[in-house]
């Protein structure tokens, strides 16, 4: 029988602070992948290496608001 884990997953909240206008398509797609598509929208995401890599790729367009 599998054990249930009750550990709380770490999360990171990001906010879009830059416009994707006149940015490469890959950066726009990364923002959409993070769930951001309009200015000042915030999303709480699971803190994984993939999400951290996406944040780093568009670090000039997003801001990390909170880490838990």
From Swiss-Prot:
Q: Which InterPro entries match?
A: Ribo_uL30_ferredoxin-like_sf, Ribosomal_uL30_bac-type, Ribosomal_uL30_ferredoxin-like
Mind telling me which GO cellular component terms the entry cites?
Answer: cytosolic large ribosomal subunit
* Keyword vocabulary terms for this entry: Ribonucleoprotein, Ribosomal protein
Q: Name one Pfam family in it.
A: Ribosomal_L30
- What Gene3D superfamilies does the record point to? Ribosomal protein L30, ferredoxin-like fold domain
Where does the source fall among the domains of life?
A: Bacteria
What Gene Ontology molecular-function terms does this entry list? structural constituent of ribosome
Q: Which GO terms describe its biological process?
A: translation
Share what the entry says about its subunit structure, partners included.
Part of the 50S ribosomal subunit.
PANTHER family from the entry? LARGE RIBOSOMAL SUBUNIT PROTEIN UL30M, MITOCHONDRIAL RIBOSOMAL PROTEIN L30
UniProt lists the family membership as follows:
Belongs to the universal ribosomal protein uL30 family.
Q: What's this protein's name?
A: Large ribosomal subunit protein uL30
